[in-house]
UniProtKB/Swiss-Prot annotation:
Reaction(s) this enzyme catalyzes, per UniProt: 8-oxo-dGTP + H2O = 8-oxo-dGMP + diphosphate + H(+); 8-oxo-GTP + H2O = 8-oxo-GMP + diphosphate + H(+)
CDD domains: NUDIX_MutT_NudA_like
Keywords, in A-Z order: DNA damage, DNA repair, DNA replication, Hydrolase, Magnesium, Metal-binding, Mutator protein
DNA repair listed as a keyword: yes
Native source organism of the sequence: Haemophilus influenzae (strain ATCC 51907 / DSM 11121 / KW20 / Rd)
Gene from which the chain derives: mutT
Protein name per its UniProtKB record: 8-oxo-dGTP diphosphatase
Gene3D superfamilies with a match to the protein in the record: Nucleoside Triphosphate Pyrophosphohydrolase
Motif Nudix box in this chain: 40-61
Amino acid sequence: MDKKIIQVAAGIIRNEFGQIYLTQRLEGQDFAQSLEFPGGKVDAGETPEQALKRELEEEIGIVALNAELYERFQFEYPTKIISFFFYLVNEWIGEPFGREGQEGFWVEQHALDAGQFPPANAKLIHRLLNETHNFI
């Protein structure tokens, strides 16, 4: 049986201080209580960037003004394959908050811990931790 491929677009919401906005997955979801980058499934007829902008508004109440593709990869789970599109978002309108009841908070980029995220995020976390940025 072929595994279903699901496209997911998520945002790396990074402020001028080098902090990244994360949310915590709700009870009842896969990987409940894990941290995640805000985003969600790409709907039929949408591009990943369109899905990202829609999901950011729905989930955390911001309007992304820019979105640069940062990382794209697939991760295979026992029953499905997730095709991830991670976008770096440095400009937005609004203050992010958990519109769907999830906790949200800012974390220093250098303090990201892959163990707090679903396994699919390990590669992305590794790349973010290896970056060097000058946030002024």
